[in-house]
Amino acid sequence: MCGIAGAVNFNLSHNTINATMYHRGPDEHGDYASGNVNFFHLRLSILDIGGGKQPMHLDDRYTIIFNGEIYNHNELRKLFNIKGTTASDTETILLLYRQFGTDFLKHLDGMFVFAIHDKENNTVLIARDRAGEKPLYYYKDNEKIVFASELNCLKGMLPLQMEEANFYHYLRLGTFYREFTPYKNVTELQAGSYLLIDCSTLQIQQSRWWNIHDFYLQENNDPFEKSVDTVDAFLHTSVKRRLESSDLEVGCFLSGGIDSGLATAIASEYNHDLKTFTVSFDDEYNEAPLAKLVADRYNTHHTEINISFNNLKSDLEKILRNYGEPFFDSSAIPAYYVSREAKKYLTVIINGDGADELFAGYRRYVPFSKY
């Protein structure tokens, strides 16, 4: 996890960025200014620790700030016969953009948000990954455009005003729907989308480079057994790539469910010294015993963190403030405690998020089966 911020026609406050997003990138920071464009990057070093410093430049024309990981970047270098001076996936993005423009996005397997300034065309490209795993918010008015990884950062640099109409979505759905945020003129860049900003006119061209809806429209007539084998192969590739893309040790969160248990089982095939972490509660919702069964089965180094009401009284406000907006999902609470404990030992974690949504893990997803 890194933190990025940038602006067109606006001077970034480095102090504010550090104050609000230091937790995203404590290892090093860098800045860039050219004409009316400003970038700032806070780095959490995971891959090519010595050679992946940012902002990164290419040909005295392109400059990038990047948050995320491209799991197949080495494969893409071989596929397109491109060579760089580092082993960094950041440089791979720049090299691919120089060669293919925005068409290269469809080849990326990863979680990412990045911004590239093209000095020759006087544009800034901002792109987000397929699932929206990495966050990006941007503010636009008639005079400037400012973007950052977190709402708290924008709020610290700009006199934002509440957009009361957008709270309808939150009160009805428990979340701000799609691009909407609590603030006027502030938009969340949608998953699988990119912005191309003309730095001279502040005009924005927004495009979807990937849409999950297209895949729902595709029929799959494979027999059940073949579908199981296909999912198994994809899961193994996914977990293996995440383990191999880090120069640091990788661990797993365990919730007691099938999703994180399966991720742990696969990870243990490639890492025989795996660390796992779970939270426990003093009530009927406690799944820690199930998590321990998985940990014992795969012989992991397991840590269990107990959460009590006394913990929550002292930490709840801090947990909520981290999101920069009202947040309805109670899973934020155990996620905070298990992450805080895991950070004592590791920097990179694999979890099982998304499995319930993809495979209808709850009864509430049954009505969608007709689609």
PLM features per residue range, with description:
Residues 1-324, 335, 339:
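Cysteine-centered catalytic environments shared across enzyme families
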Residues 284, 326, 350-353:
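Exposed, low-complexity/repetitive linear segments and helix-based recognition motifs
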Residues 327-334, 369-371:
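Catalytic subdomain that performs nucleotidyl-dependent activation
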Residues 337-371:
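Active-site adenylate/phosphate-handling loop in enzymes that bind or generate adenylated species
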